[in-house]
């Protein structure tokens, strides 16, 4: 009788036992976050963390790895702050997968995941982030990365005055766009791999219709610099500081024409005419593509918040007149890491596409101006800074 009862109990337990799949083996990868993220408030009112997770597939025996999902956790929580499946991951990795192909990390290769965390405006901020990624293998089934912890940098970001005055400006290639040439550009120079332009903005002047070129212009392929709304606008110091680097005398290219290849991945190779200010110890504001002959300051000079530094132009690696603005932790472009910041005040008129800059596609319809304070404009919104 006892033997029959035991056998019945065993049969009842078997279904539950067979449902418990073994945990995936630890992934044979190296994973790390090279530069700790710092939270900032975006123009959507949310707090954001933007950073990169580097994953290297070391072993040839494993074969190619296929990332299937990514979860990001705060501290010791088991509820993820972010969950991405394989299709969603495609938009946030470099190298980008070709065509409709699956994401894959070949043996001996590295993949970079650009992580964009959006958190409520209020509430606690995690102290540490942890990453869990499930990867498929060619020979060994699924494996799992669980770790790659990184501490969140709790230092406050700098609140800046406007780099331009009044007017309307498209905040192009801005934060939140992993495929942009700013955040998406890793710079490998002399042993360092960094992202100097992580939070850079290309500020393109627009009129009340959202057009970058004045309405008298008939042929976009043959415009003059003066046809562009933002050209020659005064460029201003965003804070008190010391001029650390200046370059002038570089020519400006005709708008919307093929650009020469950069001579180097440095400020001299990319920025054309530029000014770099140190606005706090270890915090540098870079202004690039300035108008030839317009720079008013010299290295070592002290400047005050709102002081005119130069004029907006189109020198260096630039297809059209605009101001490239960024904050980083070194005076040089190469070897520096882009750091977040906020502007003390601007108006937000809503999103605009690059095509709408030139009157193509649906006409841009500005939203009601929303005042923003101590926020960073996110990618492709039209903003206006207060007049001086």
For each feature predicted by the language model, list its residue ranges:
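Short, solvent-exposed loop/turn segments enriched in Ser/Thr/Gly
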Residues: 34-35, 45-52
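Terminal connector regions
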Residues: 118-159
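Zn2+-dependent peptidoglycan hydrolase active-site motif and core
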Residues: 240-291
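Asparagine-centered strand-capping/turn motif at beta-strand->loop junctions
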Residues: 55-62
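Acidic, glycine-rich catalytic/binding loops that coordinate metals and/or anionic ligands
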Residues: 155-173, 180-188, 214-216, 262-267, ...
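Short histidine-centered loop motifs in beta-beta connectors
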Residues: 236, 279, 283-306
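Intrinsically disordered, low-complexity Pro/Gly/Ser/Thr-rich segments with frequent PxxP/GP/PP motifs
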Residues: 79-123
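A structural signal for short beta-strand/turn segments enriched in small hydrophobics and glycine
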Residues: 241-243, 300-312
